[in-house]
Regions:
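Transmembrane beta-strands of outer-membrane beta-barrel proteins
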Residues: 42-44, 77-81, 106-110, 156-159, ...
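Outer-membrane beta-barrel "beta-signal"
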Residues: 194-195, 335-340, 345, 360-371
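Extracellular loop and loop/strand-boundary signature of outer-membrane beta-barrel proteins
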Residues: 81-82, 127-133, 177-184, 220-226, ...
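Cleavable N-terminal export/targeting peptides
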Residues: 1-31
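Sequence/structural signature of outer-membrane beta-barrel proteins
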Residues: 65-69, 84-88, 115-119, 164-168, ...
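Short loop/turn motifs that connect adjacent beta-strands in outer-membrane beta-barrel proteins
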Residues: 20, 28-40, 68-76, 102-107, ...
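C-terminal outer-membrane beta-barrel translocator/porin domains of Gram-negative envelope proteins
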Residues: 195-198, 204-303, 312
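Gram-negative/organellar outer-membrane beta-barrel architecture
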Residues: 35-44, 50-189, 289, 348-349, ...
């Protein structure tokens, strides 16, 4: 679990902005500084954390909001960028974007980034020993882009390309990654075509309070697409949001998620349990295999204008074969967290989640909801 050394800016921002809700802003000489870090158009968030394999990591995140059309017919577009650097010389630079053209005639979704950061490799499959893990470091370039065209009300059809290059792989001597026949342990070049369908009538893509989201994406990788490994992948993501009480702003959210592959899949393209999105509480990648099915629900309770709390629970499992999930391998995920509305105009929350899994637990600090 990440040991958070300090979140100075975030904590100062929370308490100072909360005070501004109840007191005259002229009493705060640093109100301009607060406005600099958070405005209706962007959020800047410095951060720091510690991991044994990286030493101290410092970084900054920027989330930019803008509209390309009328607010009533075009939802908010956003670009989220982050830069991280560790005292061991590791770094990560990444930008993710969700762009709605005027009247949502087109929707573009993608990510581009480069990293040289270690991961912890526990093995592949359900039968792993959590104490026998090893660090793996590699250079990683990633570009994925999907362009959707509206084909009906809230319906979109999309085409895209994904290119991921893993190189300079450094493994533990005599470790699993070096001695076992693991796909991609010497590096890989993944290049493939994405074909996607999307239905989305959510009122807000970063913090929905109502609506339905359904996405099915099929990815093809092989020699013909310039890929070093031949495999296919299905991603299925369905979410539903509702307000259970008319006079309150509470939200009840549900998500079903499937990650299904076949073929020669590199280790870092396998389905992974854990992290800040799917199956919170587990270390990301502590369980990985060709296929993953998961379900989670979350209740978001608003307490004050800016503050709220959540409770979440879910279950999921991995398997080597697409149609073979054993009940005994289904694992639980549950926990709770705090929410602070860091941007009222776009209804964006800063979230802190504490999740528990099967013998694991983890804490997460992020901007925007998990789903």
């Amino acid at each position: 679990m990440k040991k958070v050394l300090f979140l100075t800016y975030l904590l100062l921002h929370l308490f100072q902005t909360q005070a501004l809700d109840f007191q005259d802003t002229t009493r705060f000489s640093n109100s301009k500084l607060i406005k600099f870090f958070t405005s209706p158009k962007y959020i800047i968030s410095p951060f720091a954390f510690y991991l044994p394999e990286t030493d101290l990591v410092i970084g900054v995140g920027l989330k930019k909001f803008y509209h390309l059309g009328n607010d009533s017919t075009t939802r908010t577009s956003n670009v989220a960028s982050s830069l991280q650097y560790s005292l061991n010389g590791q770094f990560l630079l990444r930008s993710q974007y969700q762009i709605f053209a005027k009247d949502e005639k087109y929707y573009i979704n993608g990510v581009i980034g480069f990293s040289r950061f270690p991961i912890t490799f526990y093995g592949i499959g359900n039968q792993i020993d959590m104490t026998k893990n090893e660090p793996v470091t590699y250079d990683y370039f990633r570009f994925e882009n999907l362009i959707y065209r509206k084909i009906g009300k809230n319906n979109f059809a999309g085409l895209g390309w994904r290119y991921l290059n893993t190189f300079n792989v450094k493994t533990q001597q005599n470790g699993k990654m070096e001695t076992e026949p693991i796909e991609g342990n010497k590096g890989s070049t993944i290049s493939g075509l994405n074909i996607s369908y999307l239905f989305d009538n959510r009122d807000n893509i970063l913090n929905p309070s109502k609506g339905f989201f359904s996405q099915v994406t099929y990815s093809i990788h092989g020699n013909i697409t310039g890929s070093s490994h031949t495999f296919n992948r299905w991603l299925v993501d369905a979410r539903y949001y509702l307000k259970p009480f008319r006079k309150r702003e509470d939200v009840l959210a549900f998500q079903g998620y499937g990650f299904l592959t076949n073929g020669n899949v590199p280790f870092n393209e396998l389905a992974q349990m854990g992290g800040d999105i799917i199956m919170r509480g587990y270390f990301q990648g502590s369980y990985r295999d060709k296929n993953l099915l998961a379900f989670q629900s979350e209740y978001r309770l608003q307490l004050l204008k800016r503050w709220g709390i959540v409770g979440f629970a879910g279950a999921g499992g991995i398997s080597n074969e697409m149609g073979y999930f054993e009940l005994k391998n289904i694992m639980p995920s549950y926990g709770g967290g705090l929410r602070f509305k860091i941007n009222r105009k776009e209804n964006v929350n800063l979230r802190m989640d504490y999740g528990f899994g099967n013998g694991q637990q983890n804490i997460y600090f992020f901007i925007a909801e998990a789903f």
